[in-house]
């Protein structure tokens, strides 16, 4: 009877019914280890199916292996911040995808991120609120973004409520190269600002307005890993993540500083390529400007050798300094210091020439004064002519008439002509007579 019951059990009851049969009730001469390979596979399948129907805690083998951790946490681990977890150690598909990432059409990239083993990755409760995205967001990432520009807006007045997000928030594109990481960070920060998380992002001029919550940190870790695969991250980003794989804010802060540095580098290279000098400014100021640019570029990892630097400088010389383009073109080992030495020498010669010209130049006022002054060789005094023109009313006729009358008759009405004929003649008429031509 017992043997019939044993034969009625299917292989599915391998983990339950077979366990109730003792060794005394089984009468067989078959070696228990002598089992065919097909039987073993059937037993394994049956055991797996039976375990999947149970409501106990899932085995750790059902969770995908995390490449970033050698020994994953167990179900009994507790978070020092959020208290004990629920029975499930790993997040289910719904918990790992609370924001509806399937709308982006990339469900294969959603499951279990490298950050899920961190205690900070688990939400504090089963009903954590994340920004929900409508199904219309599932457009190809190559389409133009509705947000124009990559500039960072002031997010100090951004709403921190995670439940009320903007509509049509476009996700950042996928990072495909380490060289494009800084450009990708611009779009990622824009994505966080549109998701009402702009007040937790530091800028180049100020720190973050507030500290992020655990849910917000979970959201940052998940989206950062989702859109920036680890194989495309720069080395300095991997170094930060190796020390603390949840320190996304440090990565964003350092990226913003690098963006500011890159902007200065572009400005310095542009200034160096558009140099212009003609001697209108001191040579010391021109040398200091060029030297500061070269030092900044060298400190930022963009060294410029002497040959290239001299080419930039000589290209900007004009006027008399243009001669230095051809005077130094045969020197192979010419340095920037040698070129500036020639510029200083030419500038000093130019300034000395200007000073000499100003010394020998005659003053126009002095020339005008000399034209009106005559020196008498016989007499020590000089005679200066009257600068005013004679009155038109006393013409030549009147003066001639006065001379003729004074020669014919002498009287008290007329003054005698004093001095020699070579001296200036001055006539005085106390009656102030004005004669017209033809009246005498």
Curated annotation (Swiss-Prot):
Quick one: where's region Disordered? Answer: 1-86, 131-171, 350-425
| Assembly, per entry | Homotrimer.
Q: Where does the record place Polar residues bias?
A: 1-23, 48-60, 71-86, 131-152, 373-412
Q: What does this protein do?
A: Capsid protein (CA) is the structural component of the virus-like particle (VLP), forming the shell that encapsulates the retrotransposons dimeric RNA genome. The particles are assembled from trimer-clustered units and there are holes in the capsid shells that allow for the diffusion of macromolecules. CA also has nucleocapsid-like chaperone activity, promoting primer tRNA(i)-Met annealing to the multipartite primer-binding site (PBS), dimerization of Ty1 RNA and initiation of reverse transcription.
Q: What is this protein called?
A: Transposon Ty1-NL1 Gag polyprotein
The free-text domain remark for this protein reads: The C-terminal RNA-binding region of CA is sufficient for all its nucleocapsid-like chaperone activities.
Segments of this protein annotated with the region RNA-binding: 299-401
Per the record, the domain of life is: Eukaryota
* Keyword tRNA-binding belongs to the record: no
Native organism: Saccharomyces cerevisiae (strain ATCC 204508 / S288c) (Baker's yeast)
Q: Where is the composition biased (Basic and acidic residues)?
A: 363-372
Gene Ontology BP terms: viral translational frameshifting
Q: Which gene encodes it?
A: TY1A-NL1
For this protein, the record's InterPro entries field holds:
TYA (IPR015820)
- Which one of the record's GO molecular function terms can you name? RNA binding
Q: What induces it?
A: Ty1-NL1 is a weakly expressed element. Induced under amino acid starvation conditions by GCN4.
């Amino acid at each position: 009877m017992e043997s019939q019951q044993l034969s009625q059990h299917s292989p599915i009851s391998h983990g339950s019914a077979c366990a109730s049969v003792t060794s005394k009730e089984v009468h067989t001469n078959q070696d228990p280890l002598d089992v065919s390979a097909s039987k073993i596979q059937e037993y394994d399948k049956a055991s797996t199916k039976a375990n999947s129907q149970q409501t106990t805690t899932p085995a750790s083998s059902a969770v995908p292996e995390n490449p970033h951790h050698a020994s994953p946490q167990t179900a009994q681990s507790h978070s020092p911040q959020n208290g004990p977890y629920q029975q499930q150690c790993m997040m289910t598909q719904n918990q790992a995808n609370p924001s509806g990432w399937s709308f982006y059409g990339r469900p294969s990239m959603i499951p279990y991120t490298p950050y899920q083993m961190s205690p900070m990755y688990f939400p504090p409760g089963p009903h954590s609120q994340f920004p929900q995205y409508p199904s219309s967001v599932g457009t190809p990432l190559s389409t133009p973004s509705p947000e124009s520009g990559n500039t960072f807006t002031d997010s100090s007045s951004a709403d921190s409520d995670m439940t009320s997000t903007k509509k049509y928030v476009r996700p950042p594109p996928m990072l495909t190269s380490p060289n494009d990481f800084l450009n990708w960070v611009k779009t990622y920060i824009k994505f966080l600002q549109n998701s009402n998380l702009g007040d937790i992002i530091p800028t180049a001029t100020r720190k973050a307005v507030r500290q992020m919550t655990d849910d917000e940190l979970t959201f940052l870790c998940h989206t950062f890993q989702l859109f920036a695969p680890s194989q495309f991250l720069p080395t300095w980003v991997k170094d930060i993540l190796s020390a603390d794989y949840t320190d996304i804010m440090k990565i964003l802060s350092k990226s913003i500083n690098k963006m500011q540095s890159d902007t200065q580098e572009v400005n310095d290279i542009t200034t160096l390529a558009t140099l212009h000098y003609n001697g209108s400014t001191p040579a010391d100021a021109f040398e200091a400007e060029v030297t500061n640019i070269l030092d900044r570029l060298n400190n930022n990892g963009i060294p410029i050798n002497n040959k290239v630097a001299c080419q930039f400088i000589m290209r900007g010389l004009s006027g008399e300094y243009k001669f230095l383009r051809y005077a130094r073109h045969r020197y192979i080992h010419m340095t920037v210091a040698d070129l500036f030495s020639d510029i200083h020498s030419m500038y000093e010669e130019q300034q000395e020439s200007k000073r000499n010209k100003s010394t020998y130049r005659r003053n126009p006022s002095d020339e005008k004064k000399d034209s009106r002054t005559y020196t008498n060789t016989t007499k020590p005094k000089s005679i200066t002519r009257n600068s005013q023109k004679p009155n038109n009313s006393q013409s030549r006729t009147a003066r001639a008439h006065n001379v003729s009358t004074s020669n014919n008759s002498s009287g008290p009405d007329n003054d005698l002509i004093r001095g020699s004929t070579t001296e200036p003649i001055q006539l005085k008429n106390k009656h102030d007579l004005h004669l017209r031509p033809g009246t005498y």
